[in-house]
Each structure stands twice: as C-alpha cells, then as structure tokens.
C-alpha cells in the first residue's frame, strides 16, 4: 500500500491535478518538498495574508489520526487497511480544509474559519522506525514552530498510561517548546493542545479524563529542566488545553458523525472571556479555538519559504531562534488594572476615533462636535481609576505603569486632537478657497470691478478666527501636547499659499482673457495686411482710404501692429493685476508670458497666411491685378496691337519679388529681423517651471531651442521658394495665353476680293430681299438676334446645344429604324444573314496562328503608342 499515494509527493511533477487532495511537505527521508508553494497557490491560500490557520495532529501510529482528519475536515489522507496493521502516513502531509460550510440545519450561523491547513504528522512508536526517535523530535519541533493548534489523538483506554497516552511525545513537545521560544525572553507565543479522546464511552466523565491528563502534563512539565528565571513557570504560561470525546467509529457510526459535526464548529475564530481573565491574561475561550495569540504571524505567501528554512535548521541540528516578544509576569497586575481603566476610556473615545478614521479613509476629514469635553472627561476618569487600584504596589512600577497609561491615553488623545485640527485645517482651507471664488464670481456677475485683494483679506481673517475657536474648544488641560500654535502657524502658511494660488489662478484667467483679445486683434490686423498684399491695383483699385501701401514694408507694418497691440494688452493686464495685490515679480512673469504667448499667436497667424494654397492664391491675385488692370485701376481690353509681352513681363517680375520678400520676417527700415529677443526680454528670476511648461520655445530667445533668430524669422525655405516660383510661373503663363487668345480671336482672315465676288454674284438675291418686305423684316430680325447673341456671348452655348440636339436626333432615328426592322419579316431575315456572316468571319479568324496575331497585336499597340504621342504633342 502506497502511503498517501493520491497526494502530491516531493517527486511529483507539475500537474495541478496532483494537488487536488494535498501535498507531502516532508518525506520519510527528511527531504522538504519544494512544491508546497505551488500547492498553496493551487488552493488559493497564497493571497490570504494572515487569514489562514495551521493545525497539526500527533499520536501513536495506527490510532486513526488520518481517519479523524478526513471526517473532521473533509480531507483525503490515506488510512490504514482494516485487514492489516502497518504504517500508513510517512513524513508530514498537508491538505486544506474541504469542509467549508457546516450543515445549516444544525447551526445556520456557524461557519468554519477560512483557509484551514491541516498537517498529518507521521505516527510515533512505530515498528518501522523502532528506537530511532530523531524524526519524532524534529517533526514535533517543526509542527510547534509553524502550527497554532496541536491535536493529540488518543484512545480512552490509553488515558493514564505513559507511552500509550503519548506522554513521551508530549514531553518532546514541551522540551522543544522551551528550546524554541525561550531563547528570546521578550514574549511567549502560546499554542493550544487539543486532546481528542477516541472511542469515548462516557462511563468515565470527560472532566475526570481531562483532570488525569492535566495532572500527567503538569508532572511532565515539572520534571523538565528549565532556564534560569523560569523555574517556577507553569505549563499554563505557554499552553492552553482543550478536550473533546468521540464515540467509537465502527460501533456507533451515526453518533460518531454527529459528534464530529459538533466538533468541527469549534474550528473558527474565538476570544477570551473578559470576565474570566486572570492575572496572566488567560481565561476561558469563547467562540472558536483560534485565538490571535496562537498565530505565528507568517504571511501565507511566505509560509513555504519560512517552513523550508525552519526545517533546514532543524534537520541540520542548528539552533532555532525565532523572534518573539513577551511581557514580564511581575507587570501583569498593573497591566490588568491599566486595561480595566482603558475600558471606560475606550467606550468614550472609540466612537470619535472610528468617525475620524472613517472620514480620513473616505478622504473627507470631518470636524467632530463635542470632542473636547469628551476627551477631557475620559482622560480624567481613566487616570483616577488607575490611581485607586495600583497605588498600593511598588512605587517605581506604579509610577512607570502610570506613565505608560498616560502615554497611551495622551497618544490617542493627541492623535484625535491633531486629527481634529487637521480636519479644521483642511475644511478651513477649502471653505476659504470656495468663499473667495464665490465672492469673485459674484463680482463678475455684477459686471463691476471687484477688489480681489480685499476679498482675500476678509475671508482669511474669518478662516483664522474659526480655526482658533475650534482649537481652543479641543484643548486638554495639563496635557503636554495641548498647544496649537504650531498648527496655527502651518494653517496660516497654508492659507497664504492658497491665497497665492488663487491669485495666480486669477492672473492666469486674466492672462487668458488678454491673450484672446490679442488673438482677435492680431487676426483682424494681419488679415487686412495680407489681403492688401493680394491686390496690385492702383488708382480706383487702391484701398478705400488712402493710397495702396508699399509691398516692401509689409513686415514693418505687421511688426508695428503687433507691438502696439501687445503694449495695449500689457497696459490692460497691469491695470487689472494691481487689484489682485500681486507682487512685482508676479506681474513681471505675467507680462513676460503675455509677450511670448502673443508672439506665438502672431507666428501661427503668419504660418496660416504662408500656407502654400493661400500664398499661391495671393500671388495670382497680385499678378492678375497688375496684368489685367492699368495704373488707374481700369480693366485692360487686349487688342492685337497691344504690347502684351511687356505688360506680362513687368507684372510677373513684380509679383515674383514678393516670394523672397515673404520668405523672411525682415524689416525694410533696418534690413534685419525685428529685435524679438530684446522685445521679449530675459526670463524673470521668479518664474517657476510651471510658468514655462506650456510655453512654445522661440528661436533666438531660448538657448535650449537650438535655433537662431534668423531661423525663427525664416518663413519659407529655399526648396519651397523654388517650388512656389515654378508653380506661379505656370499660373502666370496660363493667364498670358488666355489674354493672347482674346486679342487675336477677333481677327478674321477673309480676302478682300471675296467681298466683291460675293456682292456681284448675290446682287439679284440682295434686290429680292430688299424689295420683299417679308424677307427684309426677317433679315432685320435675324440681324438683331445675332447681334444680341454676340453681345451676350451665347454663340458657344448655342452651337453646343445644336450639336447635342443633332446627335440625339441621329440616335433616336437609329433606334426607330432598329424597331421597324425587328417588327417586319424582311428585316429579321436580313439581320439573321448578317449574323451568319459575322460568325463565319469569326471562325476563320480563330484559325489564324498566334504569331501573326502577336505581330498584329504589336503593330496595333505601336499604332496606339503613336496616336498617344500625337495627342500629347
């Protein structure tokens, strides 16, 4: 029979199905299984943190330990065959509790603790190991270092025996307990020894069996060699005990299962009854058997590593020293009195602490009403109750414990006090900010100017008065922490910072409004300048007011408009900022940002005008105005005798000069870029990174940009200039060709002798028309119609309409003829004969070889290529 063969052993593979029933932690050769962490992950225990419990079971071999665990926790540990007596469990095995929910018809409220892990330890006193007790001692030490509860499985008839009742095993447990936990005397982690008495008949009361076992345990404890200072310690200082009896599984199966069901209800979280606590802090356990003091405080995700390290030290016979903390027994009474004094204190203060914690967790600190009187009364009563009970003890211990009690109380009260001031601080700052914003909005709605600085001063005074009133009401007399001057100073500084932030926000909004105004003004002004650039007419074609401005000074005019607009904006900004109580540094930063932002607005507008489509349109308009209109702004009507080439050349060359002019932002007066770097100025020393993060880098101004002022003022690159020149010339050539055609279009090349011949041969017809009033009137009407058609330039549309009508008439005639032939017998016969001839010709053509066809195809393609070349030409 394979021991626990359906579990994941240390040599098993990585298949998750092998973890379904558990895992072997340590095999019979004392090797630790590295797959324990995978099993915990498989059972979803790893993310549980401290929310898990570990139980180990001890007992003699073949006493039904695995059977007990399987029935109690729904596990699947292998059990011994009823037909033979031999070792079943080898090493240490681990499985998670599978019985999560109790039967709700028994106890609807009962529920076992989450993530209960059960370790089945190899039985003792087995013939397989014989006299070798090394593994027995090592497994006991391992279980005690990791487990909260140690279940001792014994039979009723073994009670009172030494070996049969596992007293040798328990002595080992006590010895390793001293070895494990007494090296660090700061604390004493407790463990629970849970005796499960099997085959319990009830003849001997369970209480009597319990007394017998406790007497044996105390006798074993007394026989142990204890460290110095702990000679008088008792077993109850380190262990709690619990007892349960189970009927015979085979003779009373139903009753056995009922008692197992009842027993399972005890495996949940419990607590000690406060009324039964003794001087050592122990007492009866209520609820479940899992107490916080039993837990080893090892997170679930690190348990496998922790257990492996513990076993490595144990198996290599190294000293196992676990960090613990313990209070001295001499201080228990004072600690008990202190706890009793804190009970009433907790009742008064805990509600305020809970409310404050909930408010902090929700992110909305709340000023608690009535906190000051409650703190003063609770502190006074707690100290008085402690003095009454503890003043009879040793003065030094009494004073030390009183100081500790006061420190505990003051620590909690100080936390409440600081939390109250923090809530008053945060709510006060928030109310201050909201009040200032509301007052500013009210002033804006009225449409009148408001004094921002006066609003801030008034609201700041009200906020400080409210904070001081709340702080005074929370003070506790005689408390060393009862001083709020530091918090008041921090509050005032925070109000000052908030005031500065509100002022900066208001100045940002002011700057945004001014920037919008600058954008609107610059947009209109620059549009007018570039629109004037598109008109090359003079005389009556000049602007409505004044003469047409010179094209060469366009950048001078744009720069002047820009500087004047920004100066006006700076004046508006400075006047409005004076009411904000802003310092000179803040105003300087605002003006500096305004100049940079304004340049960005101008540059964006210029880039928009310099877009290829817009620029080509303006160049064409400029050229056409110079070519189609004379100096007086009168449209030109071209005649064959006009010098079109000269006018074209002058207009084209004049327009071409605009491309290099517009390529760079350069003043005509100085023949250099405008002094942008001097105009913007250096970065103010008070400017913060937040003031610069939304600014666009400017070449020649920002050293980090890597661009010079010349590059910043370059609007069109060389490649784009050449492309614009070529495209403009093509456009101008088209206008020139159109003008040339219009000039020569009216010339008729008719020989003079044709008119004499026409007059001689048509004399009779002329006389007939002149003598006949009808013909004469018809001729007169036709002449009038032809003249009107010519003046309205309708000859072209009339000719096109005539051609379209004639084409439609031909198509309609073909359709009618086809319908006639299809309707008559003669026509159908003729169409059939024509179809037969076509089929014969197609059959004969299909018999031709591919080579002539290919030659013909190449010839046809060559002909098509020639036709295409002719069309292109």
Swiss-Prot record:
PANTHER family: PROTEIN SEY1
Keyword Transmembrane: yes
Membrane-spanning residues: 750-770, 774-794
Organism name: Ajellomyces capsulatus (strain G186AR / H82 / ATCC MYA-2454 / RMSCC 2432)
Coiled coil spans: 482-506
Pfam families named in the record: RHD3_GTPase, Sey1_3HB
Main location: endoplasmic reticulum
EC number: 3.6.5.-
Designated name of the protein: Protein SEY1
Function, in words: Cooperates with the reticulon proteins and tubule-shaping DP1 family proteins to generate and maintain the structure of the tubular endoplasmic reticulum network. Has GTPase activity, which is required for its function in ER organization.
Gene Ontology terms: biological process: endoplasmic reticulum membrane fusion
UniProt subcellular location: Endoplasmic reticulum membrane
